Amino acid sequence: MDQGEDVLVKRTTIEKFSKTYYPDFENDGTRKYILTYDPASRLDNSVVLVAELFRDEEKGLMLKLVNMVNLVERAKDGTSMVIQKPKQMEIFKNMMVDYNLGYVDYEGIDSVFIDAGAGGGGFEVGQHLLTDFKGKDGRLHRGIIDPENEYMKLYKDDYPSADPILNLFSFKKDKTAAYEATQAMINQGLVIFPKGLNVRNELEFEVENPDGSMSIKYEKPGLDEINSITQMDLAKEELMGMQKTKKPNGTIVFEQTPAAKSNNLHDDWIQSTILVTL
């Protein structure tokens, strides 16, 4: 059953533009990616999304969601907690290295978007990314900078080697416009989503038989792949759980549907997804 007309993205739309494929965990030397990061310090989820940016002959530039990671860990008592910020930074920097494999810094990465809201310390994260760093490959890699940010551009002369691919975005300032832009891109079929796993945690590929008939080929992904696809499923659910509402004063806002609220959906996965379409 589909949702109402005011929903951000309908389930039928997500299903229409979903395909079966494995996540990407590194660049093969031919692709270009966008990374987004919605950091958290304590209670929320801290989500990183990776999308491949490519050009379709008919539609032009498109996005394909290829990996999503929630930077949380299990405490000794079994509760979920956000990984400490220094470790988060190390993981994110090494993801930048992975998705730039085969390229000079950072020709394999189109852009990096970070939610600069105060809650997750997004601006602080951006400051940590200014400095050159040694990656897990043992090599020194350039830092990155947002040259348009009113505060970060003050550091430009202090970090001359920083690559200007960083974008610090404030949802507080431009949330409605950002959500509407994402809605338009998805409805136009410019974003490809991964299909979810079946009940046995398998990927289902449609294959054509020699006689022209179609059948299903089942493949069992690894644990990291299962986790990635599961995280992207959560992003899809949050997209479908958001609706446009007009307040009495005429202001347009996007907020969770009553059903999403009753299911205790968050907004951490959707924020990273919104960022990737900016």
Cite the ranges covered by each PLM segment.
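RNase H-like, metal-dependent nuclease domains and their acidic two-metal-ion catalytic environment used
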Residues: M1-K153, T176, E180, N201-L278
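Short alpha-helix plus adjacent loop in nuclease-associated cores
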Residues: I144-E204
